[in-house]
From Swiss-Prot:
Its main location: cytoplasm. Residues 103-112 have a biased composition (Gly residues). The gene is gacJJ. The keyword Repressor does not apply. It comes from Dictyostelium discoideum. Residues 301-402 form the PH domain. GO terms for molecular function: GTPase activator activity. Residues 628-694 form the SH3 domain. The lineage of its organism: Eukaryota, Amoebozoa, Evosea, Eumycetozoa, Dictyostelia. Gene3D superfamilies: Pleckstrin-homology domain (PH domain)/Phosphotyrosine-binding domain (PTB), Rho GTPase activation protein, SH3 Domains. Residues 64-147 are annotated as: Disordered. Pfam families: PH, RhoGAP, SH3_9. This is Rho GTPase-activating protein gacJJ.
Length: 873
């Protein structure tokens, strides 16, 4: 069960990552949930150091909240927040809409989805009339069973527009290139497809893989519906985990639609000899391993489907998703699982009511009709919440036999079994093992009391294993309700093993499956105060019995650690022992590889969480104030700063030498941090320092994750190389595009030139210009202009000389006029005469230059007039 809808803002969203990465999923918070999906992809990839965010897309999966869960006389879990859990019914792979509504297109159109006529993105499909108009996948006939839904998210839509507050929400980061399976009735091919490109692009590859002569008459189907090849997987919202059916109408050997058996509307099977997933006729019924390969979504319109509880080999109850056809009963870990966890052929089993420990609890027992001597007989138990739920499932092929039908007198033994089961301690919910005012189960109290009094100084207590036979004997005594005196036991390791076994066999761990992701996310926080505060909040939110047992147990383990000098069990040793027994993730029986990956990724964090619960007990389980974390940094360089006394106190620089240890009080986002050194406070560049490890849990997590660090480094190097190659390919493609664009531009210019040359108007103008170049008068224009400028300069010089002479004469005349009595001697007369002669020469010369200038101007004017006449033509 997921957290309430508002909790994603507190704990963040569960982000799933593609296979092959460093982790399967991670809890991640966003500062703003109003960002677009594309921006969310950018943030996710940046935080994980992933390259090429444009190559990823997001897919949201979630479960519908059950309308009610009947317990005793009341309804629990009704959904009061319908807005946050609104089903995405307009999408393939989501829940079924009303029969009158179209699927995938958002209501009325058939361009992007499945229409009522039975096509995906098309408007006709006369061949597949056996399918119903609405029952495609995830049809819930039980009102209590949640439906798993999925949808490809639009990059341009806002993140908050999707039901982030729904149950079990997972935002899957998926690559745009997806692996799909295509089946033609004979063979299955794995193909890579870009979910954003039209599926018509895929048909060439299909033709090559299946060696088709032509794809013009080939069609693809999924969910029994024909796919519109002009659209893409993302727009059609197709679940790529399901196979595509390839059919060629012109090929007589092609998969015929008659071979697609809807099995009276109860199930989806292909062919009589096995098809998708290998499900075949009764002849193949014994091939259980082959039959388990049936994807949950490939079973269309089952008789019944929904969540029930099934007992596993360890006698603990697991919630599984069941699908019942007219012959088989399948159970899956989730409605979207690609492989069944198990399968029963109903006609081969005796089905009868099993004894129950609760008055309103009903269980069915499935016993094989044909047993082989010496072989292990597997009896299946399925639990229902009440008789009403059982009646909903009591439909063919499930026929409940009476006690006499199986030849055993259950009436004589049921009471004894009930009494025995009622006293069972191991493998039952922890709240059922306490009585009265005592919140701690007796087995926990007695084992801890024994160890405190007899085994606190035993070397390797809890680390070394006790006798398995002895542990099983004590377990049997507790389960039978016998009086137990552990102090008779001489092997303290057996008693310690008994306590670990009890914790390990709890059907729901002490820290609960529900809060697994929240605890992992809390322990992953680096800041000590924030981490402890969130862990404390989560611990206090546990059920009362869980909290009481956890507090009692962690206080005891802390006492064991104080005897480490004798027992050699330090805190980190004990955290490694108890961590996996306190918290674990649900295991997928059909996905062993994924379980191992999760175990490798989360084990260091689980051990660190147990370490926090033991070492920081006083902060988590008491009211002791959580101290603020001191963040220390070592200076890499000397920082002289600016300490001239003119800056304000807030902007004052912090001066320090190289190698100094600085207390960081604030880490600014602008690259400037605030800190304290030798009693002085101030700012300094963040690039000048290196943070020092400040948390023992951080050191432990770093040490435990050494292998992951190497793997991450290798993966980053591979991703970097891949990115460089992609960038090179991208540049080559861009250069090719640029080359083609330049060639196209050159061709356009040449065509334009040819068109201009052939234009009559342009031709006439070109001829006119050619004739103008041969005209002598026009050819003389530049020369005449040069002559004109030359004459003008000469005229200007003579004019200036004339003005100077004029000024001189005026001055001399005024001098002479002012002194008429002065006599001129011969020499002075000659000088005046000489000046006069020079002046006359200059004036004559100027007159000639002026005349030539006027003539040149006239010539130029005439030439310009002639040129104007030519161009006016």
């Amino acid at each position: 069960m997921a957290a309430p809808s508002s909790n994603y803002q507190l704990y963040g969203l569960k982000i799933g990552f593609p296979p092959g990465g460093l982790m399967r999923n991670k809890q991640m918070k966003f500062n703003d949930y109003g960002i677009t999906v594309k921006e969310a992809i950018q943030i996710i990839t940046n935080k994980q150091g992933m390259q090429n965010p444009d190559s990823y897309t997001l897919q949201i999966t979630y479960s519908d909240e059950p309308s009610s869960i009947n317990t005793s006389s009341g309804n629990i879990g009704s959904n009061n927040n319908s807005s946050s859990n609104t089903p995405l019914t307009g999408s393939l792979g989501m829940g079924p809409p009303p029969p009158s509504a179209s699927i995938g297109g958002g209501g009325g159109g058939g361009d992007n989805g499945i229409t009522n006529s039975g096509n995906i993105g098309s408007s006709s499909n006369s061949d597949l009339k056996k399918s119903t108009s609405s029952g495609i996948v995830n049809v819930n006939n039980s009102s209590n069973a949640p439906t798993r839904r999925l949808k490809w998210m639009d990059d341009n839509e806002k993140l908050i527009s999707y039901p982030l507050g729904a149950h079990d929400v997972v935002i899957e980061l998926k690559k745009k290139y997806q692996l799909i399976k295509v089946y033609d009735g004979k063979q299955t091919m794995n193909l890579i497809v870009d979910i954003t490109k039209p599926l018509s692009d895929l048909m060439d590859l299909v033709s090559c893989k299946f060696k088709l002569r032509s794809t013009s008459d080939c069609k693809l189907f999924t969910y029994g519906k024909e796919i519109n090849l002009n659209s893409n997987i993302k727009n059609l919202n197709i679940d790529t985990s399901l196979p595509f059916i390839l059919r060629d109408n012109n090929d007589p050997n092609s998969l015929s639609l008659e071979s697609i058996q809807w099995d009276n509307g109860n199930g989806f099977f292909v062919g009589g000899n096995g098809g998708i997933g290998g499900i075949g006729s009764d002849d193949d019924a014994d091939d259980i391993n082959n039959n388990l390969s049936v994807p949950a979504k490939s079973i269309i319109n089952p008789v019944r489907e929904g969540y029930l509880k099934k007992q596993d080999k360890k006698k603990s109850w697991k919630t599984r998703y069941f699908k019942l056809t007219d012959k088989y009963l399948y159970w899956y870990k989730s409605p979207t699982a690609i492989k069944a966890s198990g399968m029963i052929i109903c006609k081969d089993y005796h089905i009868k009511l099993a004894p129950s420990t609760h008055s309103k609890e009903v269980k069915l027992e499935f016993t094989p009709k044909h047993m082989i001597a010496g072989a292990t007989t597997i009896i299946h138990y399925i639990k229902f919440e009440n008789e009403q739920e059982l009646k909903q499932w009591t439909v063919l092929p499930i026929v409940i036999e009476s006690s006499n039908d199986s030849g055993s007198n259950n009436s004589n033994t049921s009471g004894g079994n009930q009494s025995m089961i009622g006293k069972k301690v191991f493998g039952v919910p922890i709240e059922k093992t306490v009585s009265g005012n005592n919140e701690i189960p007796a087995v926990v109290l007695q084992t801890i009391d024994y160890i405190e009094k007899k085994a606190m100084d035993i070397v390797g207590i809890f680390r070394l294993s006790g006798s398995v036979l002895t542990i099983e004997q004590w377990k049997a005594k507790y389960d039978k309700g016998e009086k137990v005196d552990l102090f008779q036991e001489v092997d303290p390791h057996a008693v310690a093993g008994l306590l670990k076994l009890y914790l390990r066999e709890l059907p729901d761990p002490l820290l609960t499956y529900e809060k697994y992701d929240n605890f992992i996310a809390a322990q992953s926080i680096d800041d000590f105060p924030s981490r402890i505060k969130l862990i404390k909040h989560l611990v206090k939110s546990l059920p009362p019995v869980n909290y009481a047992v956890l507090s009692y147990l962690m206080a005891f383990v802390g006492k064991v650690a104080t005897h480490s000098a004798a027992n050699k069990m330090q805190v980190h040793n004990l955290s490694t022992v108890f961590g996996p027994n306190l918290i674990k993730d649900r295991q997928d029986s059909g996905d062993y590889g994924n379980n191992v990956q999760v175990l490798v990724e989360d084990t260091p964090i689980i051990n660190a969480l147990a370490l926090s619960l033991i070492r920081d007990y006083q902060y988590i389980f008491t009211d002791k104030e959580i101290p603020e974390q001191k963040i220390l940094a070592k200076s890499l360089y000397e920082y002289a700063g600016n300490d001239d006394g003119t800056t304000s106190e807030d902007d004052k620089d912090l001066l320090f030498p190289k190698g100094a240890t600085i207390k960081v009080t604030q880490q600014g986002t602008d690259g400037w941090w605030t800190g304290e050194y030798q009693g002085k406070q101030g700012k300094f560049p963040a690039s000048y320092v290196e943070l020092l490890p400040h948390s023992p849990s951080t050191l432990l997590r770093t040490k435990s994750n050494s292998n992951l660090t190497k793997k991450k480094k290798f993966m980053l190097e591979m991703e970097s190389t891949k990115t460089k190659n992609q960038e090179i390919d991208k540049n080559i493609k861009q250069l090719e595009i640029t080359k083609k664009e330049l060639e196209s531009t050159i061709n356009d210019l040449e065509n334009e030139k040819a068109a201009l040359e052939n234009d009559p108007t342009i031709k006439a103008m070109m001829n006119l210009l050619a004739n103008a170049k041969t005209n002598k008068d026009i050819a003389m224009i530049p020369k005449n202009i040069d002559v004109l400028f030359q004459k003008f300069e000469e005229y200007k010089s003579s004019h200036e000389a004339l003005a100077t002479t004029k000024t001189t004469l005026i001055d001399e005349y005024e001098q002479f006029n002012n002194n008429p009595k002065k006599r001129l001697d011969t020499k002075e007369k000659e000088q005046i005469q000489q000046k006069y002669d020079n002046l006359s020469i200059i004036i004559d010369k100027s007159q000639k230059i002026r005349s030539k200038s006027i003539n040149s101007k006239k010539i130029i004017n005439d030439d310009l007039v002639e040129l104007k006449k030519i161009f006016s033509l």
